Amino acid sequence: MFSLHFPQVSYSDPWLQPLSERLATLNRRAVRIAYFYEEPNNSTFRYRAYNMAQVLNAQDAENVSASYFFLFDRDHFDEIADCAQMLVICRSRYCHEINGLITKFRARGKRVLFDVDDLVFDTDYTHLVVATLGLDVRQDRLWDDWFAMMSRMGQTLKLCDGAITTNEFLASKLADFSGLSVSVVPNFMNQEQLSLADRVYELKAEACFKGNGRKTLGYFSGSPSHRLDYAIVEPALADVLAQRPDVEVMVVGYIEHGPSMQKFAGRVSRQPFHDYVNLQRLLGSVEFNLMPLQSNAFTDCKSELKYFEAASVGTLSIASPSFTYRGAIRDGENGYLAKAH
């Protein structure tokens, strides 16, 4: 493990700006793009709207400005449609307000695109998604919720002129379902993450990447839905802990250990869910970042974000050979690919 003398930084959501500021940002330049998401969060909204707007606004030479808007801005949809030249709807479920927003842009002869980062728009995959997430398939309400959500997502997609997604595998699913033209814009880190990641990497480089003599394997879970993914790697973790007294495990987030890990409790640490900026500190403190995934069409649609967030702080990843992980990792060179066994 790396002993990083690096305090936790103060964090608050940088996207919580009043509408007046977001409109002013949109109006800064000649080419103006409005991103829409139902409500702000630190997952899809951050990657597919906030980060996109941030990088577009940083490119002075392109004369492009961008901002983001939400359902609670509904009273100003006409103003947004007047100002922006293009609308990007990010992973949003159909409702009369979203239909109205799209209609306003269409009535003004403006292009509308749909951006999605998961296979959550085609109900043919609902059972696969539910099973992969480990949800209770015996609950009728669960099926109502998931079929409704994915159907509404697909309906919003069908109202748009084109689509954007995170990788070629998901792009093919989008094109097959919608018949629309699909472009790939991969996920990437924002400036807040990169600034802290650079500092963490520099500290490790100054120490010549020498830790405290103990090797730590880290599993960083963004949500409880990764329970079955973690279950893939847990037996191997127990074997490694039994064979290597110098190895420790750190689990971050919502995952609960199985019984095989109980006898190693003294070498298994838990960390609560962290904001995405301070998470870079934890990522930088471990030698290896574990990225197990079940093998199916839903997980092949996942992006490589867990890989590059770890790489930015000089942490190697051990990943399942999913579509995107195979594309990002050259086995034995910039990480490792490992099948479940």
List each model region and its residues.
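N-terminal pre-catalytic "stem/leader" segment of glycosyltransferase-like enzymes
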Residues: 1-88, 127, 228
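A short, active-site helix/loop in glycosyltransferases that binds the activated sugar's phosphate group
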Residues: 156-184, 188-194, 256
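Nucleotide-sugar-dependent
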Residues: 122, 228-231, 275-282, 287-312, ...
